[in-house]
Amino acid sequence: MTYISRTMLWQRYLGTRISSTILPVAVRRIHYGGGRLQDPRYVFSKPPTNDPNQSKEGRDGKHFFTPSVNDGTENSTLHNNSRLSESEMSSIANAIAEQKRKRLKRSIITIFSAFVTAVLGYTIGYKVWYLKEQSFIPLYPCSRVRKLSTRDLRRVSVKKIEDISEVRVLERLSQHKMIQEEYGVPLRDSNGKAPHVSDFSVWCEDQDPCVTGLVFEPDSNRQSSHSWYRIPYVFKWRITHRPISISSFIDDVLNWINVSTSDLFEVISPEKVYGSFKYEYPIQGDNHSLHICFLGEMKLDENTTVIYKGKYHVDVKLERIDLLRTENKKLVRYILFKEEDEK
């Protein structure tokens, strides 16, 4: 019989007590269910199944908070119940589109405000206040044809143009064979007197494209023929029309880089600007190509009227003369003179 001391018995007793206390904490027990071992990945959750009607507690962990879609079958009942209606989807889409439109509108307003601020700051703040110079802001293109301004009327005599054009028209009519045969020479109207102009109009035509814009100047007491809108002690402004000279713009760009047009080419073409008046002097004060055009009407009798058109630059230059006459209750036009026919 083996002798066991009290010390060994005491050690065995303590070891048994300690192991019985520690092992339940450190060792995981494996439970058996249905004859199969439980998957250790789903100790704290239930494994997924292929049953579409299973509860949420038995679903796949990847779709715990969202409905799953079965492969090869229609969407689950929960998924169908959670689908948004067409009206709700349309409302969401409209809200997103409205938000985008508001954002785009804010961006456009910001860019436009920055552009206007920069233009006004340079035009008024720098050129008018600092440099004390005149500045011009173009707004929109305008027609090349315009009425004579008050300043133009002081430099051009409309009565003189009317009288000279009347003489030139009578000269042309007296040389025409149709007028000589049907009305005779010297030409007389129904009252037996020399025909006179009954209606006459004058206007300007710029050769260069024109724009309408705002002119700014420092506010001063200097007299001017123009009507100004004023902000006292700040600046004054008015609306005006100005031509855009492409050749002058090119000259300015070349001068900025210390190159002149004479270094590149030299073209002399007075016919382009002054036509047949290349040996005449232009009107003083004009810094761009400007034509003064006129249209006149002269009656020969109750059924016959002469209409003529031309340009004025120191002298009158006729472009066209038409005769309008009523024949068999119809208005017939005869072209008596046309400038292109003589070239």
From Swiss-Prot:
Cleavable signal peptide: none
In which residue ranges is the amino acid composition biased (Basic and acidic residues)?
54-63
Which residue ranges are recorded for the region named Disordered? 41-84
Its keywords, alphabetically, are:
Membrane, Mitochondrion, Transit peptide, Transmembrane, Transmembrane helix
* Transmembrane portions of the chain: 108-130
**Membrane topology type, per the record?**
Single-pass membrane protein
Protein's UniProt keywords contain Transport: no
Subcellular location, record wording:
Mitochondrion membrane
Where is it mostly found?
mitochondrion
- Chain intervals with Polar residues compositional bias: 67-84
Transit peptide (first-last residue):
1-29
Q: From what superkingdom does this record's organism come?
A: Eukaryota
Its Gene Ontology cellular component terms are: mitochondrial membrane
Protein family: Belongs to the AIM39 family.
How is this protein named in the record?
A: Altered inheritance of mitochondria protein 39, mitochondrial
